[in-house]
């Protein structure tokens, strides 16, 4: 008890010395150097059309937002990874040149790499109808390029990763956590037999130990600690770590507990291109994760964070236009909408696994009553897929936009959309079960499948973490204030 009181008094003293600190947080800026488009044509057009990101506008978006940040005059700018489209050297050099504009105005900048940024075989030039390999960078080169933005001076660096601990403002320690697996990437351009690339994240054991040591040391000196990582630490909706395992850091519950125990109560992340704020607990203590969407993907969010005493306050900003496109927001929304149906194919693949389990369960029940018809899923796959897309494509597109915008539960369309999606899923499940059961199908689905789907959908579209449990929590995604 006395130790906690002493730490609290020291922290208060440090906070009073530093005063309020203003931070701008961005993530997944995915900038592409304009030099990579040697000649506009089918190659870049096809690539850009297949993506939710506004790739062709990315450089102008970054320039525009940097200008707005200079007007705001924050103390620090923090960017939680995926600085480039695909790790192109030219794109990194462009990003660094834009960050120099901030440094020239006395604004501290801290970055960490994302999964796209290092040793990426997808680095390309675009020339009319052709694409060809562009130079990517190594981990050492990343450190060199961003030596003024977290990787130089008196910053403490982890020897096992690109993690670091910096004190950009007296009394505030920022721990940049490298959660990437780019060391495992293979590139033909470097003599490997194949190109491989890793989206998923993990923190090495030695790195986690180093991080917690840095946090404990800072706390013992009465300093505030904020962490920054590319991958999610907390599930922002139920079962995120199962459904989107590449977007939540491996062993996330253990990492969460270790960070909380070390005194880390706030972390900035990105990766999923979703602006969402979530909170989780361990032994009555908490950590709040502020995930910020991609700067070049609708709704084009970035954040202002104010740290005052022991409180962190978050405000969300939206870029609506750029000089070359006054309709950026509307065009960006259409870009997301056109990409959703393709993404749903991976959802359908997972759903087919659920349907197979449901069908086996039903077959077991039927066997107790003398057997009966069992659905040949392979033969019915096309029918199920057609029903899935007919029932859910439009609804899922609306849901996707709602998720990206944040504060889903406050959206007046949320309740209606939940009901419609439940009805659509029920129709898909019904199409997958033996027709000979007639009215029994609906009752079986309602009892055995829909509670799980309903909880999942409500967690996502009502913005509820640990939905329906005593640990359920809802945090405002756009404007939040909390102790840390």
Task: Give the ranges of each region predicted by the language model.
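Hydrophobic h-region of N-terminal signal peptides that target proteins for export
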Residues: 9-17
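His/acidic metal-ligating clusters that form di-metal
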Residues: 69, 73-76, 108, 173-175, ...
């Amino acid at each position: 008890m006395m130790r906690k009181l002493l730490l609290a008094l020291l922290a208060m003293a440090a906070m009073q010395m530093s005063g309020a600190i203003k931070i701008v947080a961005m993530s997944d800026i995915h900038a592409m150097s304009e030099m990579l488009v040697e000649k506009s044509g089918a190659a870049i057009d096809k690539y850009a059309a297949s993506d939710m990101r506004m790739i062709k506008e990315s450089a102008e978006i970054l320039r525009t937002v940097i200008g707005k940040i200079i007007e705001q005059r924050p103390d620090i700018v923090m960017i939680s990874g995926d600085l480039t489209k695909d790790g192109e050297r030219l794109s990194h050099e462009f990003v660094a040149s834009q960050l120099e504009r901030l440094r020239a105005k006395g604004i501290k900048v801290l970055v960490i790499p994302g999964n796209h940024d290092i040793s990426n075989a997808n680095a390309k030039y675009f020339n009319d109808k052709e694409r060809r390999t562009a130079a990517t960078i190594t981990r050492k080169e990343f450190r060199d390029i961003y030596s003024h933005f977290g990787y130089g001076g008196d910053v403490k660096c982890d020897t096992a990763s690109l993690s670091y601990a910096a004190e950009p403002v007296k009394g505030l320690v920022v721990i940049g956590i490298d959660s990437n697996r780019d060391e495992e990437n293979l590139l033909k351009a470097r003599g490997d037999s194949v190109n491989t690339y890793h989206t998923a994240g993990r923190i090495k054991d030695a790195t986690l130990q180093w991080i917690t040591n840095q946090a404990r040391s800072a706390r013992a000196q009465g300093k505030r600690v904020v962490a920054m990582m590319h991958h999610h630490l907390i599930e922002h909706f139920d079962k995120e770590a199962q459904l989107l395992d590449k977007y939540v850091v491996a062993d996330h519950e253990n990492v969460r507990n270790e960070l909380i125990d070390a005194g880390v109560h706030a972390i900035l992340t990105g990766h999923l291109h979703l602006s969402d704020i979530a909170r989780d607990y361990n032994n009555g203590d908490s950590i709040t994760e502020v995930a910020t969407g991609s700067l070049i993907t609708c709704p084009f969010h970035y954040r202002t964070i104010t740290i005052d005493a022991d409180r962190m306050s978050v405000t969300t900003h939206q870029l609506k236009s750029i000089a070359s496109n006054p309709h950026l927001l509307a065009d960006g929304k259409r870009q997301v909408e056109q990409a959703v149906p393709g993404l749903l194919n991976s959802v359908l693949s997972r759903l087919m696994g659920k349907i197979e389990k449901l069908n086996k369960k039903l077959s077991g029940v039927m066997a107790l009553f003398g057997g009966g018809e069992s659905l040949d899923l392979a033969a019915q796959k096309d029918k199920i897929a057609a029903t899935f897309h007919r029932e859910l494509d439009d609804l899922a597109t609306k849901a996707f936009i709602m998720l990206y915008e944040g504060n889903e539960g406050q959206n007046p369309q949320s309740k209606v959309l939940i009901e419609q999606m439940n009805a659509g899923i029920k129709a898909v499940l019904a199409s997958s079960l033996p027709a000979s059961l007639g009215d029994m199908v609906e009752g079986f689905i309602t009892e055995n499948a829909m509670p799980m789907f309903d909880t999942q959908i409500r967690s996502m579209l009502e913005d509820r973490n640990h939905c329906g449990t005593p640990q359920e929590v809802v945090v405002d995604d756009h404007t939040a204030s909390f102790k840390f």
